[in-house]
Every structure is written in C-alpha cells, then in structure tokens.
C-alpha cells in the first residue's frame, strides 16, 4: 500500500490563518490577540499547530468577522 503524505487538519487551518494574516497585513501581536494567545505561541503553532483549539479558532473567526470557509483557498479562487 502506498503511503500518502497528507497535511493534518490543524496544520492546514494554521497555514490558512497565516496566509490570511499576510494578505491582511496583520501583525503577529494582532493575530495573537485575536486568538487569545501570547505572541510566542504563534511560533509554537508554526512548528506544530496541534495545540490550537476550536475555541481559539472560533474566537479568531468571530473577532475578524470571518467564517471558516473564508480561510479556504478554494472559496476565493473557485466560488460555489
């Protein structure tokens, strides 16, 4: 059986949050505040995002008036 390298859901979500941050020109401190974490925690998430919680994600989405689908690459490039 072939082994498939797949990206974990938490890593995918974190990558999309970082992409959104870059596109919106948001500072690390502003991002940390919207996730209710310390700024250094962002670097921990960069290494391994498995500790990001749904509570943190929900707060981030709420503060920024986003929906989960807004973080999706496909929602911008291939609307349905």
Regions found by a protein language model. Give the residues of each.
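Alpha-helical residues within the helix-turn-helix
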Residues: 22, 33, 62
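Residue-level signal for the short linker/turn that defines the boundary of a DNA-recognition helix
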Residues: 15, 25-26, 52-55
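Short alpha-helical DNA-recognition segment
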Residues: 25-44
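A short, Lys/Arg-rich alpha-helix, primarily the initiator
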Residues: 1-24
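Short, charged recognition helix plus adjacent turn
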Residues: 1-7, 72-80
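Residue-level detection of the helix-turn-helix DNA-binding "recognition helix"
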Residues: 18, 22, 36, 47-49, ...
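DNA major-groove recognition helix of helix-turn-helix/homeodomain DNA-binding modules
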Residues: 55-70
């Amino acid at each position: 059986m072939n082994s498939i390298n797949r990206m974990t859901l938490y890593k995918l979500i974190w990558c999309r949050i970082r992409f959104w941050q870059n596109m919106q020109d948001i500072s690390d401190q502003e991002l940390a505040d919207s996730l209710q974490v310390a700024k250094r925690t962002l670097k921990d998430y960069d290494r391994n995002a498995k500790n990001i919680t749904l509570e943190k994600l929900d707060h981030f989405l709420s503060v920024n008036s986003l929906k989960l689908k807004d973080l999706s690459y496909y929602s911008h490039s291939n609307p349905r």
